[in-house]
Amino acid sequence: MYIFVSRPRKCTLFFVIGHLKDEGGDIMTKEVLSAIQDAVGTQVFGIWFLIGAAFVFFMQAGFAMVEAGFTRAKNAGNIIMKNLMDFCIGTCVFIPLGFGILLGEDALGGFIGTPTLGIFTDYANFDWSNFVFNLVFCATTATIVSGAMAERTKFLSYCIYSAVISAVVYPIEAHWIWGGGWLASLGFHDFAGSCAIHMVGGTTAFIGAALEGARIGKFTRDKDGKVTKVHAFPGHNIVIGALGCFILWFGWYGFNGAAATTGPQLASIFMATTIAPAIATVVCMIFTWLRYGKPDVSMCLNASLAGLVAITAPCDVVDATGAIIIGVVAGLLVVFGVWFCDNVAHVDDPVGAVAVHCLNGIWGTIAVGLFATKTAPECTLKGLFYGGGFHQLGLQLLGVVTVMAWTIITMTIVFKIIDKTVGLRVTEEEEIVGLDVKEHGLASAYAGFSLMDIIEGSMSINENTELGENDYDEASEAQRAASVKVTAPVDPETGIHKVVIIAKLSRYEKLKTALNDLGVTGMTVTQVMGCGVQKGAGEKYRGVEMDVTVLPKVKVEVIVGSIPVDKVIETVKRTLYTGHVGDGKIFVYNVQKVVKVRTGEEDYDALKDVE
């Protein structure tokens, strides 16, 4: 058997199968076979290492889709631009600074790596694979932040702090963990980044969202500034959000598995990366179903990501039982995190980045010290629940505390400096109009579609709207001011009427059939959005009761002349009635004149469609 392997570090492997014998004609020794297998294994996993990096790069698309889908349409272009630029800007600063700090020679007692320009001065011996691999991980840390600070952050400010994260903040703490720094020397374990990437990104997201404040209309406050109500801002396209979730889950097999060194270890990592998010999603579905009355779609998408984040650090050291327990906790923790941000911390996080990445990054890191088992391939650790005592758990807690402290201190300083110089947040007008228009000159990310953004979509009951008096003379002054006393039709009767019907979309087909059976031969149909005073419990979005936001309705307009208008009204009422709020309304108008454009016929003659 002849084997030709390309130059060292190259990811090309060429085999020619034949018969290999030594000079004496004997079959090759076991030692030679073992050496060949090792060489082949090294090359195969070297190739997989780079394929995994490509998987992680593709996760940028997943983050972009999740963030765009979970926010409003007027900011979709801005979200896409941020997710593109944080990678591109991160690459620019990672070349001269970030890579050396992360994997350079230890300095300051393992606190930081020594920056190097080897990519320019010694390219032939440069560690190309590790550069690409660590670059895509670095970009993930920066992109996590954009979701929590979406819809109100200046694009320039985003570019600045993304550069700082990629150049300094992430490389230093990642050096502690993966670059041979002080945490690594102690035995801290974070295989793929629950702590180094997700907790850091989620913590930065929380700090940034808290410092710049909530989106306009997210919280209602009293005169003392106390939050009295939380408003739900549903994402404009849950389908795009779901696509992003699936892209991320797919990419996570590379995220977690790329650094595997043996086939069994890779298989075990894939298993854990499948079990934990699946369990987390099912647990979240059941919990939201019980808690809110219906399974929450967006929360379940977040739960899938939460399970993936939580399994990232321990994916190589846990068995199936550990992965299941980690997933169960992640599914509950993400719901708690979203509720906590909205109702306790009053931090506006549009996509749930804090709950998904920060809280579950912490949980996944701690889980190593609880569920690590030597039955996992290549694992040498034992967690608390597998007879390992508190040693590894203590190391994991130390890592969480120190990395979080580093992140809080550095990013608070960075955000404060940005806010005092170029400004962190856009103006009120820019936020209301949308960042697509104001920041990028993009009229709409969906060309040809009109975008409507209504912050407060409900009508409230007050002294002017509760008009229950039968006699106008007995009404209060406020009620009189809000009402119009009608004694006679404004327009003279012509015998021709316009009937406008607002109804539920679900009743349209029955309404059309009933009107057709009545003799109505033509109608104008428009899909509209409507709202009104809503009494009773409303729907929930991510655990927050929604104001009666504008709901889809159908508006049907018909012109009747020979058909008695009372008969039309009775037919419509009978067809639309269900006994529930929102059955619809009927408006009747006098029509002064009808003109058929083609023939010039008027009134009744113009209404005849049959020649």
Which residue stretches match the model-derived regions?
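Generic detector of low-complexity/intrinsically disordered segments
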Residues: 15-17, 22, 35, 469, ...
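Positively charged, small/polar-rich N-terminal and surface patches that mediate targeting and assembly
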Residues: 438-444, 457-611
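Glycine- and aromatic-enriched membrane alpha-helices
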Residues: 29-487
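Sequence-pattern detector for short linear motifs
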Residues: 10-12, 85, 510
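Short, Lys/Arg-enriched N-terminal segments with co-localized hydrophobic residues
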Residues: 1-27
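Enrichment for repetitive, rod-forming helical segments
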Residues: 14-17, 67, 89, 205, ...
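General helical secondary-structure elements
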Residues: 3-5, 26, 78, 421, ...
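Compositionally biased, intrinsically disordered low-complexity segments
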Residues: 6-8, 17-20, 219, 487-489, ...
